Amino acid sequence: MDINEKVLLLAILKKESNESLNDIVLKLENTGMFSLKEGKKLLKKLKTEQFISDSFLTLKGDAIAKNVEQEFKI
């Protein structure tokens, strides 16, 4: 899993209840993390790999996102 995927999963974990996945991608695009096209491609990949379902993390996605959070705290 590359750094962009990790950051996106963490951002989804930390998203506000009124934010959509597209809002998260747009925020990360504004920071220069990746382009909108790349962000949407990453979302699709994470959905295909069953890290995301609808607008939420799956149990698998949640576990990975929490590991990423710990990784970034170091």
What is each residue range found by the language model?
Residues 2-31:
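Short amphipathic alpha-helical interface segments
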Residues 18-19, 34, 52, 74:
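A general structural signal for well-ordered secondary-structure junctions
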Residues 19-23, 37-38, 56:
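Alpha-helix N-cap and coil->helix boundary residues
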Residues 31-48:
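Short amphipathic alpha-helical interaction segments
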Residues 47-56:
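A short, conserved structural fragment
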Residues 57-62:
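Residue-level signal for threonine
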Residues 63-74:
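Short, amphipathic alpha-helical interaction segments positioned at domain boundaries
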